Curated annotation (Swiss-Prot):
The gene is IFIT1. One of its GO terms (molecular function) is RNA sequestering activity. InterPro entries: TPR-like_helical_dom_sf, TPR_2, TPR_rpt. Phosphorylated. ISGylated. Gene3D superfamilies: Tetratricopeptide repeat domain. This is Antiviral innate immune response effector IFIT1.
Length: 478
Protein backbone atom coordinates (compact mmCIF):
# COMPACT_ATOMS: atom_id res chain seq x y z
CA UNK A 1 0.00 0.00 0.00
CA UNK A 2 1.42 3.37 -0.96
CA UNK A 3 2.08 6.12 1.54
CA UNK A 4 1.29 9.81 1.17
CA UNK A 5 5.03 10.39 0.88
CA UNK A 6 5.24 8.08 -2.14
CA UNK A 7 2.26 9.86 -3.68
CA UNK A 8 3.84 13.31 -3.33
CA UNK A 9 7.19 12.10 -4.60
CA UNK A 10 5.63 10.59 -7.73
CA UNK A 11 3.50 13.72 -8.26
CA UNK A 12 6.58 15.97 -8.04
CA UNK A 13 8.29 13.83 -10.68
CA UNK A 14 5.23 13.84 -12.93
CA UNK A 15 5.11 17.64 -12.93
CA UNK A 16 8.52 17.69 -14.63
CA UNK A 17 7.36 15.68 -17.65
CA UNK A 18 6.61 17.12 -21.10
CA UNK A 19 3.26 15.69 -22.16
CA UNK A 20 -0.45 16.42 -22.55
CA UNK A 21 -0.95 16.59 -18.78
CA UNK A 22 1.57 19.43 -18.38
CA UNK A 23 1.07 21.40 -21.62
CA UNK A 24 -1.93 23.40 -20.36
CA UNK A 25 -4.25 22.46 -23.21
CA UNK A 26 -7.25 24.74 -22.76
CA UNK A 27 -10.33 22.59 -23.42
CA UNK A 28 -13.79 23.71 -22.25
CA UNK A 29 -16.13 20.98 -21.00
CA UNK A 30 -18.70 21.72 -23.72
CA UNK A 31 -15.94 21.49 -26.37
CA UNK A 32 -15.04 17.93 -25.36
CA UNK A 33 -17.56 16.01 -27.55
CA UNK A 34 -16.55 17.93 -30.69
CA UNK A 35 -12.84 17.52 -29.90
CA UNK A 36 -13.25 13.77 -29.43
CA UNK A 37 -15.22 13.50 -32.70
CA UNK A 38 -12.52 15.43 -34.58
CA UNK A 39 -9.77 13.26 -33.10
CA UNK A 40 -11.61 10.06 -34.07
CA UNK A 41 -12.28 11.44 -37.57
CA UNK A 42 -8.60 12.25 -38.00
CA UNK A 43 -7.55 8.75 -36.94
CA UNK A 44 -9.97 7.18 -39.43
CA UNK A 45 -9.89 9.55 -42.40
CA UNK A 46 -6.67 11.60 -42.45
CA UNK A 47 -3.89 9.70 -44.19
CA UNK A 48 -0.79 10.90 -42.40
CA UNK A 49 2.56 9.68 -41.19
CA UNK A 50 2.04 11.59 -37.96
CA UNK A 51 -0.61 9.55 -36.14
CA UNK A 52 1.16 8.82 -32.84
CA UNK A 53 0.34 12.23 -31.41
CA UNK A 54 -3.38 11.99 -32.16
CA UNK A 55 -3.63 8.70 -30.21
CA UNK A 56 -1.90 10.43 -27.29
CA UNK A 57 -4.41 13.27 -27.47
CA UNK A 58 -7.29 10.79 -27.58
CA UNK A 59 -5.90 9.16 -24.44
CA UNK A 60 -5.84 12.55 -22.70
CA UNK A 61 -9.45 13.26 -23.74
CA UNK A 62 -10.51 9.82 -22.46
CA UNK A 63 -8.81 10.59 -19.14
CA UNK A 64 -10.62 13.94 -18.86
CA UNK A 65 -13.89 12.03 -19.35
CA UNK A 66 -12.94 9.68 -16.50
CA UNK A 67 -12.28 6.75 -18.86
CA UNK A 68 -8.76 5.82 -17.76
CA UNK A 69 -8.89 2.22 -19.01
CA UNK A 70 -9.80 3.54 -22.47
CA UNK A 71 -6.97 6.05 -22.15
CA UNK A 72 -4.50 3.20 -21.54
CA UNK A 73 -5.75 1.45 -24.70
CA UNK A 74 -5.13 4.58 -26.77
CA UNK A 75 -1.64 4.93 -25.32
CA UNK A 76 -0.89 1.31 -26.18
CA UNK A 77 -1.98 2.04 -29.77
CA UNK A 78 0.34 5.07 -29.80
CA UNK A 79 3.19 2.89 -28.53
CA UNK A 80 2.57 0.24 -31.21
CA UNK A 81 2.41 2.90 -33.95
CA UNK A 82 5.68 4.35 -32.70
CA UNK A 83 7.46 1.08 -33.35
CA UNK A 84 6.06 0.95 -36.90
CA UNK A 85 6.44 4.58 -37.92
CA UNK A 86 9.51 5.80 -36.05
CA UNK A 87 11.52 2.68 -35.20
CA UNK A 88 14.82 4.50 -35.73
CA UNK A 89 13.95 7.23 -33.19
CA UNK A 90 11.38 5.40 -31.06
CA UNK A 91 13.09 6.06 -27.73
CA UNK A 92 12.95 9.88 -27.97
CA UNK A 93 9.55 9.85 -29.67
CA UNK A 94 8.19 7.55 -26.93
CA UNK A 95 8.87 10.07 -24.16
CA UNK A 96 5.48 11.77 -24.55
CA UNK A 97 3.59 8.45 -24.61
CA UNK A 98 5.46 7.09 -21.58
CA UNK A 99 4.87 10.36 -19.73
CA UNK A 100 1.14 10.11 -20.43
CA UNK A 101 1.17 6.47 -19.24
CA UNK A 102 2.76 7.62 -15.97
CA UNK A 103 0.11 10.28 -15.43
CA UNK A 104 -2.83 7.98 -16.18
CA UNK A 105 -1.51 5.27 -13.83
CA UNK A 106 -0.99 7.93 -11.15
CA UNK A 107 -4.61 9.07 -11.45
CA UNK A 108 -5.70 5.42 -11.20
CA UNK A 109 -3.75 5.08 -7.94
CA UNK A 110 -1.34 2.58 -9.49
CA UNK A 111 1.84 4.25 -8.30
CA UNK A 112 4.20 1.34 -9.00
CA UNK A 113 3.26 1.37 -12.68
CA UNK A 114 3.48 5.17 -12.77
CA UNK A 115 6.98 4.95 -11.31
CA UNK A 116 7.94 2.27 -13.85
CA UNK A 117 7.14 4.66 -16.71
CA UNK A 118 8.93 7.49 -14.92
CA UNK A 119 11.99 5.24 -14.81
CA UNK A 120 11.73 4.60 -18.56
CA UNK A 121 11.61 8.35 -19.19
CA UNK A 122 14.57 8.92 -16.86
CA UNK A 123 16.67 6.33 -18.69
CA UNK A 124 16.22 8.15 -22.01
CA UNK A 125 16.87 11.57 -20.44
CA UNK A 126 20.18 10.41 -18.91
CA UNK A 127 22.59 12.25 -21.16
CA UNK A 128 25.63 14.28 -20.15
CA UNK A 129 24.26 17.28 -22.05
CA UNK A 130 20.78 17.09 -20.47
CA UNK A 131 20.43 18.79 -17.05
CA UNK A 132 16.90 17.45 -16.46
CA UNK A 133 15.95 14.14 -14.88
CA UNK A 134 12.50 13.68 -16.42
CA UNK A 135 12.41 15.95 -19.45
CA UNK A 136 14.34 16.57 -22.61
CA UNK A 137 14.47 19.57 -24.91
CA UNK A 138 14.24 18.23 -28.46
CA UNK A 139 12.42 19.23 -31.67
CA UNK A 140 10.38 16.00 -31.79
CA UNK A 141 8.68 16.82 -28.48
CA UNK A 142 8.23 20.48 -29.50
CA UNK A 143 6.43 19.12 -32.56
CA UNK A 144 4.20 16.78 -30.49
CA UNK A 145 3.24 19.71 -28.26
CA UNK A 146 2.44 21.78 -31.35
CA UNK A 147 0.10 19.11 -32.76
CA UNK A 148 -1.73 18.81 -29.43
CA UNK A 149 -2.21 22.58 -29.13
CA UNK A 150 -3.31 22.88 -32.75
CA UNK A 151 -6.05 20.28 -32.29
CA UNK A 152 -7.41 21.91 -29.13
CA UNK A 153 -8.80 25.07 -30.69
CA UNK A 154 -8.10 28.66 -31.60
CA UNK A 155 -6.97 29.88 -28.20
CA UNK A 156 -3.95 27.59 -28.57
CA UNK A 157 -2.91 28.43 -32.16
CA UNK A 158 -0.23 31.02 -31.34
CA UNK A 159 1.44 28.62 -28.93
CA UNK A 160 1.19 25.83 -31.51
CA UNK A 161 2.93 27.99 -34.12
CA UNK A 162 5.69 28.82 -31.63
CA UNK A 163 6.25 25.10 -30.95
CA UNK A 164 6.63 24.28 -34.64
CA UNK A 165 8.93 27.28 -35.13
CA UNK A 166 11.11 26.02 -32.30
CA UNK A 167 11.15 22.51 -33.81
CA UNK A 168 12.15 23.90 -37.22
CA UNK A 169 15.12 25.71 -35.68
CA UNK A 170 16.67 22.30 -35.13
CA UNK A 171 15.69 20.85 -38.52
CA UNK A 172 14.66 23.32 -41.27
CA UNK A 173 13.80 20.66 -43.86
CA UNK A 174 11.78 18.32 -41.64
CA UNK A 175 8.51 17.45 -43.47
CA UNK A 176 6.46 16.98 -40.29
CA UNK A 177 7.65 20.18 -38.58
CA UNK A 178 7.06 22.10 -41.81
CA UNK A 179 3.53 20.65 -42.09
CA UNK A 180 2.64 21.67 -38.53
CA UNK A 181 4.01 25.19 -38.97
CA UNK A 182 2.15 25.68 -42.27
CA UNK A 183 -1.19 24.49 -40.86
CA UNK A 184 -0.88 26.64 -37.71
CA UNK A 185 0.01 29.66 -39.90
CA UNK A 186 -3.02 28.97 -42.13
CA UNK A 187 -5.33 28.76 -39.10
CA UNK A 188 -3.97 32.01 -37.64
CA UNK A 189 -4.44 33.77 -40.98
CA UNK A 190 -8.07 32.64 -40.94
CA UNK A 191 -8.53 34.27 -37.54
CA UNK A 192 -7.18 37.60 -38.78
CA UNK A 193 -9.07 38.01 -42.08
CA UNK A 194 -11.15 40.88 -40.68
CA UNK A 195 -8.15 42.70 -39.18
CA UNK A 196 -7.12 45.81 -41.12
CA UNK A 197 -3.44 45.95 -41.97
CA UNK A 198 -2.81 42.31 -41.05
CA UNK A 199 -0.28 40.71 -43.39
CA UNK A 200 -1.11 37.08 -44.02
CA UNK A 201 1.94 34.88 -43.80
CA UNK A 202 0.89 31.28 -44.46
CA UNK A 203 1.40 31.18 -48.25
CA UNK A 204 5.18 30.62 -48.16
CA UNK A 205 5.02 28.03 -45.32
CA UNK A 206 2.31 26.14 -47.25
CA UNK A 207 4.42 26.14 -50.42
CA UNK A 208 7.39 24.85 -48.42
CA UNK A 209 5.29 22.15 -46.73
CA UNK A 210 3.85 20.97 -50.07
CA UNK A 211 7.35 20.77 -51.58
CA UNK A 212 8.48 18.58 -48.64
CA UNK A 213 5.25 16.50 -48.67
CA UNK A 214 4.37 16.23 -52.40
CA UNK A 215 1.78 13.46 -51.85
CA UNK A 216 -0.14 15.28 -49.11
CA UNK A 217 -3.53 16.21 -50.59
CA UNK A 218 -4.65 17.96 -47.40
CA UNK A 219 -1.75 20.43 -47.61
CA UNK A 220 -2.40 21.01 -51.32
CA UNK A 221 -6.02 21.95 -50.76
CA UNK A 222 -5.03 24.41 -48.00
CA UNK A 223 -2.48 25.93 -50.39
CA UNK A 224 -5.22 26.18 -53.04
CA UNK A 225 -7.44 28.13 -50.63
CA UNK A 226 -4.62 30.46 -49.63
CA UNK A 227 -3.81 31.17 -53.29
CA UNK A 228 -7.51 31.92 -53.82
CA UNK A 229 -7.34 34.37 -50.89
CA UNK A 230 -4.42 36.08 -52.63
CA UNK A 231 -6.22 36.44 -55.95
CA UNK A 232 -4.29 33.56 -57.55
CA UNK A 233 -7.31 31.32 -58.10
CA UNK A 234 -6.07 29.71 -61.34
CA UNK A 235 -2.88 28.45 -59.68
CA UNK A 236 -4.92 27.39 -56.65
CA UNK A 237 -7.23 25.32 -58.83
CA UNK A 238 -4.24 23.35 -60.17
CA UNK A 239 -3.31 22.29 -56.63
CA UNK A 240 -6.97 21.60 -55.90
CA UNK A 241 -7.26 19.26 -58.88
CA UNK A 242 -4.08 17.44 -57.80
CA UNK A 243 -5.52 17.00 -54.30
CA UNK A 244 -8.84 15.68 -55.64
CA UNK A 245 -7.06 13.26 -57.98
CA UNK A 246 -5.14 11.83 -55.03
CA UNK A 247 -7.08 9.23 -53.03
CA UNK A 248 -5.41 10.15 -49.72
CA UNK A 249 -7.40 12.00 -47.02
CA UNK A 250 -10.37 12.43 -49.38
CA UNK A 251 -12.87 13.25 -46.64
CA UNK A 252 -10.64 16.12 -45.48
CA UNK A 253 -9.83 17.23 -49.02
CA UNK A 254 -13.55 17.35 -49.89
CA UNK A 255 -14.23 19.68 -46.94
CA UNK A 256 -11.74 22.30 -48.07
CA UNK A 257 -12.24 21.81 -51.81
CA UNK A 258 -15.92 22.59 -51.21
CA UNK A 259 -14.95 25.88 -49.57
CA UNK A 260 -12.86 26.75 -52.64
CA UNK A 261 -15.77 26.02 -55.00
CA UNK A 262 -18.31 27.88 -52.84
CA UNK A 263 -16.16 31.00 -52.81
CA UNK A 264 -15.69 30.64 -56.58
CA UNK A 265 -19.49 30.61 -57.00
CA UNK A 266 -19.76 26.90 -57.88
CA UNK A 267 -22.14 26.19 -55.00
CA UNK A 268 -23.65 23.01 -56.48
CA UNK A 269 -20.19 21.46 -56.84
CA UNK A 270 -19.37 22.47 -53.27
CA UNK A 271 -22.54 20.84 -51.94
CA UNK A 272 -21.83 17.65 -53.85
CA UNK A 273 -18.42 17.30 -52.17
CA UNK A 274 -19.71 18.26 -48.72
CA UNK A 275 -22.51 15.68 -48.84
CA UNK A 276 -20.00 12.97 -49.78
CA UNK A 277 -17.82 13.94 -46.82
CA UNK A 278 -20.84 14.10 -44.48
CA UNK A 279 -21.65 10.46 -45.23
CA UNK A 280 -18.29 9.53 -43.68
CA UNK A 281 -18.32 12.02 -40.78
CA UNK A 282 -21.98 12.82 -39.99
CA UNK A 283 -21.22 14.75 -36.78
CA UNK A 284 -18.59 17.04 -38.32
CA UNK A 285 -19.22 20.58 -37.11
CA UNK A 286 -17.15 22.04 -39.94
CA UNK A 287 -19.15 20.15 -42.59
CA UNK A 288 -22.55 21.17 -41.21
CA UNK A 289 -21.42 24.80 -41.05
CA UNK A 290 -20.06 24.71 -44.61
CA UNK A 291 -23.26 23.11 -45.93
CA UNK A 292 -25.29 25.81 -44.18
CA UNK A 293 -23.14 28.47 -45.87
CA UNK A 294 -23.79 26.85 -49.26
CA UNK A 295 -27.56 27.00 -48.78
CA UNK A 296 -27.19 30.61 -47.62
CA UNK A 297 -25.21 31.35 -50.82
CA UNK A 298 -27.95 29.75 -52.95
CA UNK A 299 -30.56 31.88 -51.17
CA UNK A 300 -28.55 35.02 -51.95
CA UNK A 301 -28.14 33.99 -55.61
CA UNK A 302 -31.93 33.69 -56.03
CA UNK A 303 -32.53 37.01 -54.27
CA UNK A 304 -30.04 38.77 -56.53
CA UNK A 305 -31.48 37.15 -59.67
CA UNK A 306 -34.99 38.35 -58.70
CA UNK A 307 -33.78 41.80 -57.55
CA UNK A 308 -34.93 41.03 -54.02
CA UNK A 309 -38.53 40.33 -55.10
CA UNK A 310 -38.79 36.51 -55.31
CA UNK A 311 -42.24 35.14 -56.13
CA UNK A 312 -43.80 31.76 -56.80
CA UNK A 313 -41.24 28.98 -57.25
CA UNK A 314 -38.35 31.31 -56.43
CA UNK A 315 -39.98 32.20 -53.10
CA UNK A 316 -40.47 28.49 -52.37
CA UNK A 317 -36.83 27.78 -53.23
CA UNK A 318 -35.64 30.53 -50.90
CA UNK A 319 -37.81 29.22 -48.06
CA UNK A 320 -36.35 25.75 -48.63
CA UNK A 321 -32.78 27.10 -48.62
CA UNK A 322 -33.47 28.94 -45.36
CA UNK A 323 -34.88 25.79 -43.71
CA UNK A 324 -31.90 23.69 -44.85
CA UNK A 325 -29.38 26.31 -43.75
CA UNK A 326 -31.02 26.53 -40.32
CA UNK A 327 -30.95 22.74 -39.96
CA UNK A 328 -27.22 22.54 -40.65
CA UNK A 329 -26.28 25.59 -38.57
CA UNK A 330 -28.31 24.13 -35.68
CA UNK A 331 -26.47 20.82 -36.11
CA UNK A 332 -23.13 22.65 -35.97
CA UNK A 333 -23.87 24.53 -32.74
CA UNK A 334 -25.47 21.48 -31.14
CA UNK A 335 -22.24 19.53 -31.63
CA UNK A 336 -20.05 22.49 -30.66
CA UNK A 337 -21.87 25.00 -28.40
CA UNK A 338 -18.83 27.34 -28.38
CA UNK A 339 -18.82 27.77 -32.20
CA UNK A 340 -19.49 31.53 -32.24
CA UNK A 341 -19.41 32.03 -36.02
CA UNK A 342 -21.99 29.27 -36.60
CA UNK A 343 -24.22 30.78 -33.89
CA UNK A 344 -23.98 34.13 -35.68
CA UNK A 345 -24.86 32.57 -39.04
CA UNK A 346 -27.78 30.80 -37.36
CA UNK A 347 -29.09 34.05 -35.84
CA UNK A 348 -28.99 35.75 -39.25
CA UNK A 349 -30.81 32.83 -40.85
CA UNK A 350 -33.54 32.97 -38.18
CA UNK A 351 -33.97 36.63 -39.17
CA UNK A 352 -34.35 35.56 -42.82
CA UNK A 353 -37.02 33.10 -41.68
CA UNK A 354 -38.82 35.86 -39.75
CA UNK A 355 -38.30 33.98 -36.48
CA UNK A 356 -37.27 36.94 -34.32
CA UNK A 357 -37.77 35.07 -31.05
CA UNK A 358 -35.19 32.43 -31.98
CA UNK A 359 -32.88 35.10 -33.37
CA UNK A 360 -33.06 36.98 -30.06
CA UNK A 361 -32.35 33.78 -28.08
CA UNK A 362 -29.31 33.04 -30.25
CA UNK A 363 -27.96 36.58 -29.94
CA UNK A 364 -28.33 36.40 -26.15
CA UNK A 365 -26.21 33.23 -26.14
CA UNK A 366 -23.64 34.97 -28.32
CA UNK A 367 -23.47 38.03 -26.06
CA UNK A 368 -22.49 35.75 -23.16
CA UNK A 369 -19.61 34.17 -25.09
CA UNK A 370 -15.95 35.15 -24.93
CA UNK A 371 -14.54 34.64 -28.43
CA UNK A 372 -10.81 34.16 -28.89
CA UNK A 373 -10.80 36.70 -31.72
CA UNK A 374 -11.88 40.26 -30.84
CA UNK A 375 -13.28 40.80 -34.34
CA UNK A 376 -15.85 38.06 -33.67
CA UNK A 377 -17.20 39.97 -30.66
CA UNK A 378 -17.30 43.14 -32.76
CA UNK A 379 -19.36 41.28 -35.37
CA UNK A 380 -21.74 39.91 -32.72
CA UNK A 381 -22.50 43.46 -31.51
CA UNK A 382 -22.76 44.80 -35.09
CA UNK A 383 -25.22 42.10 -36.19
CA UNK A 384 -27.27 42.44 -33.01
CA UNK A 385 -27.37 46.23 -33.46
CA UNK A 386 -28.69 45.77 -37.01
CA UNK A 387 -31.27 43.30 -35.74
CA UNK A 388 -32.41 45.86 -33.15
CA UNK A 389 -32.49 48.68 -35.71
CA UNK A 390 -34.20 47.00 -38.65
CA UNK A 391 -36.24 44.13 -37.19
CA UNK A 392 -37.01 45.18 -33.62
CA UNK A 393 -37.19 48.92 -34.52
CA UNK A 394 -35.30 49.84 -31.35
CA UNK A 395 -32.92 52.67 -32.19
CA UNK A 396 -31.77 52.94 -28.57
CA UNK A 397 -30.63 49.30 -28.38
CA UNK A 398 -29.10 49.56 -31.84
CA UNK A 399 -26.99 52.55 -30.77
CA UNK A 400 -25.90 50.73 -27.60
CA UNK A 401 -24.56 47.76 -29.56
CA UNK A 402 -23.00 49.80 -32.38
CA UNK A 403 -21.09 51.59 -29.61
CA UNK A 404 -20.13 48.30 -27.96
CA UNK A 405 -18.71 47.07 -31.27
CA UNK A 406 -16.78 50.33 -31.68
CA UNK A 407 -15.53 50.23 -28.08
CA UNK A 408 -13.55 47.06 -28.92
CA UNK A 409 -10.63 49.01 -30.34
CA UNK A 410 -9.18 46.27 -32.56
CA UNK A 411 -8.80 47.89 -35.99
CA UNK A 412 -10.99 45.92 -38.38
CA UNK A 413 -13.38 46.19 -41.30
CA UNK A 414 -16.18 45.19 -38.91
CA UNK A 415 -15.40 48.16 -36.64
CA UNK A 416 -15.48 50.45 -39.68
CA UNK A 417 -18.89 49.03 -40.64
CA UNK A 418 -20.13 49.67 -37.10
CA UNK A 419 -18.97 53.29 -37.25
CA UNK A 420 -20.68 53.82 -40.62
CA UNK A 421 -23.89 52.11 -39.46
CA UNK A 422 -23.97 54.31 -36.36
CA UNK A 423 -23.45 57.40 -38.54
CA UNK A 424 -26.37 56.46 -40.83
CA UNK A 425 -28.68 55.87 -37.87
CA UNK A 426 -27.71 59.15 -36.19
CA UNK A 427 -28.20 61.16 -39.42
CA UNK A 428 -31.63 59.54 -39.80
CA UNK A 429 -32.52 60.63 -36.25
CA UNK A 430 -31.29 64.18 -36.95
CA UNK A 431 -33.46 64.38 -40.07
CA UNK A 432 -36.46 63.79 -37.83
CA UNK A 433 -35.22 66.15 -35.11
CA UNK A 434 -32.30 68.50 -35.81
CA UNK A 435 -32.22 69.45 -32.11
CA UNK A 436 -31.60 65.91 -30.82
CA UNK A 437 -28.78 66.50 -28.33
CA UNK A 438 -27.69 62.85 -28.11
CA UNK A 439 -27.55 62.48 -31.90
CA UNK A 440 -25.47 65.64 -32.30
CA UNK A 441 -22.99 64.35 -29.70
CA UNK A 442 -22.86 60.92 -31.33
CA UNK A 443 -22.23 62.44 -34.76
CA UNK A 444 -19.35 64.42 -33.28
CA UNK A 445 -18.00 61.18 -31.84
CA UNK A 446 -18.30 59.43 -35.23
CA UNK A 447 -16.40 62.20 -37.01
CA UNK A 448 -13.73 62.09 -34.30
CA UNK A 449 -13.30 58.33 -34.87
CA UNK A 450 -12.97 58.96 -38.61
CA UNK A 451 -10.28 61.57 -37.98
CA UNK A 452 -12.43 64.49 -39.24
CA UNK A 453 -11.69 66.79 -36.32
CA UNK A 454 -13.26 69.95 -37.79
CA UNK A 455 -16.62 68.23 -38.30
CA UNK A 456 -16.31 66.60 -34.87
CA UNK A 457 -15.78 69.99 -33.18
CA UNK A 458 -18.67 71.50 -35.12
CA UNK A 459 -21.17 68.90 -33.88
CA UNK A 460 -19.77 68.87 -30.32
CA UNK A 461 -20.16 72.69 -30.22
CA UNK A 462 -23.72 72.48 -31.55
CA UNK A 463 -24.52 69.91 -28.86
CA UNK A 464 -22.96 72.10 -26.15
CA UNK A 465 -24.87 75.20 -27.32
CA UNK A 466 -28.09 73.21 -27.37
CA UNK A 467 -27.41 71.89 -23.87
CA UNK A 468 -26.66 75.41 -22.63
CA UNK A 469 -29.86 76.79 -24.20
CA UNK A 470 -31.85 74.00 -22.60
CA UNK A 471 -30.27 74.69 -19.19
CA UNK A 472 -31.03 78.42 -19.46
CA UNK A 473 -34.64 77.75 -20.39
CA UNK A 474 -35.02 75.48 -17.37
CA UNK A 475 -33.55 78.14 -15.05
CA UNK A 476 -35.80 80.87 -16.42
CA UNK A 477 -38.84 78.64 -16.08
CA UNK A 478 -42.14 78.96 -17.97
Amino acid sequence: MSTNGDNHQVKDSLEQLRCHFTWELFIEDDEMPDLENRVLDQIEFLDTKYNVGIHNLLAYVKHLKGQNEEALKSLKEAEDLMQKEHANQASVRSLVTWSNFAWVYYHMGRLAEAQAYLDKVENICKKPSNPFRYRMECPEIDCEEGWALLKCGGKNYERAKACFEKALEGDHENPEFSTGYAISAYRLDGFKLATKGYRQFSLLPLRQAVSLNPDNGYLKVLLALKLQDNGQEAEGEKYLEEALANMSSQTYVFRYAAKFYRRKGSVDKALELLKKALQETPTSVLLHHQIGLCYKAQMIQIKEATKGQPRGQNREKIDKMIRLAIFHFESAVENKPTFEVAHLDLARMYIEAGNHRKAEETFQKLLCMKPVVEETMQDIHLQYARFQEFQKKSEINAIIHYLKAIKIEQTSFIRDKSINSLKKLVLKKLQRNALDLESLSLLGFVYKLKGNMNEALEYYERALRLAADFENSVRQGP
